Amino acid sequence: MDTALPVERRIDDLIARLTLTEKINQLLHENNAVERLGVPAYNWWNEACHGIGRNGRATVFPQVIGLAATWNRDLIARVAEVISDEARAKHHAAVAAGRRGQYQGLTFWTPNVNIFRDPRWGRGQETFGEDPVLTGELGAAMVRGLQGSHPRYLKTAACAKHYAVHSGPEQDRHGFDARPSQKDLFETYLPAFQRLVESGVEAVMGAYNRTLGEPCCASSLLLGDILRGRWGFAGHVVSDCGAIDDFHQHHRVTRTAAESAALAVKMGCDLNCGCTYHDLVVAVREQLITEAEIERSLRRLLRTKFRLGLFDPPEQVPWSGISPEIIDSTPHRALARQAAAESMVLLKNNGVLPLRRDLESLLVTGPTAANVSVL
């Protein structure tokens, strides 16, 4: 753990000290601590679609479909920078208090750059809309704001999801086989992901569905030929939560959890959101996968952790001194207000706007009018 050594040397040293079981645990989204080596516990699952999610008070920005309506790359980058400031403040406060659970890490499964082609899709508000170019440009701006520009450290790690051809409906996603034409695949569904890879996104999340017959989290086409081959992606790939189980439970491309885990890792899915990778112990015993193949994925994940400064003293890591006082602060709320104002598109007025200045009260109505978590 000598911080003076090059990162790759430190990764080599750590991998050499881990047992097979410890290596496999590091490929699950909920990492146990390796106390004998001073490796802390870490949970990879965190969300920041339009502000830090599910972790207490935070500045709430407009939904992503609203941010897309601003057409403002600089604004999106500033929004993401505020999110990453608050993320660092929350993370370091949590670690200081001995809390390392879900939603307290620095790896955010954001942004969602799927194409919102059908308005019936219930998660379309998470996306930047139906246009691949706009989605790519604004998604890249969000990556820039989340990850920062430090030459050694990532401020937080962004993740392009859900790769690929994943645009609803939710009910069918665990067994659906998307079969786009080559033209539609490369002109509609993939350009935004390519743009985020070019912008340096640290992670890519594989989708639940199959694309052209292969599960996205074990696709030789998507993960091998395109993502790492043509685009040169060097970060890590994470499965959507429970997606590896779908291999044998719904897609029926494997028979057992061990076969599913082995197939996913061999095809390049490094991190399992779920628990299927526990069966890699069985997969090694049954000679479905080698320890070297497991170490290839482990190396990518450790590289992300080192880039986040998770193995370095706090005083050596930029942003470790950000005060929790900045969370949901007046300047951050002002930026959220600006983003909301720029997101609004007036389609019809009928003389209602601008509102009279002498109004004493306004009625906000609807099923979620008082639901802050939804808004």
Model-predicted segments: where are they?
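Glycoside hydrolase catalytic-domain context in secreted enzymes
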Residues: 1-375
